[in-house]
């Protein structure tokens, strides 16, 4: 899922560049993916003076990718970038210890993610894309500072 979300809205994506250059977002913009027993959730978050416009742009970008699909070269580049980020995360002792604890309590091996990540294909990403990011199951939540 992280590969999919990074291709759509990561810092090197067309969407991010367009929103940032248009001053609709700042560098706090990003995404998260949550999952648990019986649920999952994608969250796009950040600061904006026009959150409705940002939401419209995100929905529009998802729609464009539904029509055009994802480029194999962009997929491979994103996959390598995120794999490298996973490896760099191993240099952080506190983060590694946290990941090991989370994996242990989930009954998993912290290094299994590396093996799984290496086997992900563009077809896998397209399959999950077909099942997720439905605009009819989305909501915009805005927290005003006042």
Stretches found by the model and what they are:
Residues 5, 15, 28-30, 56, ...:
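Residue-level detector of functional hotspots within protein domains
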Residues 6-53, 115-137, 145-146:
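Non-catalytic beta-strand/loop surface segments
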Residues 10-11, 33-89:
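M16/insulysin-pitrilysin zinc metalloprotease superfamily fold
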Residues 79-146:
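C-terminal regions of mature proteins
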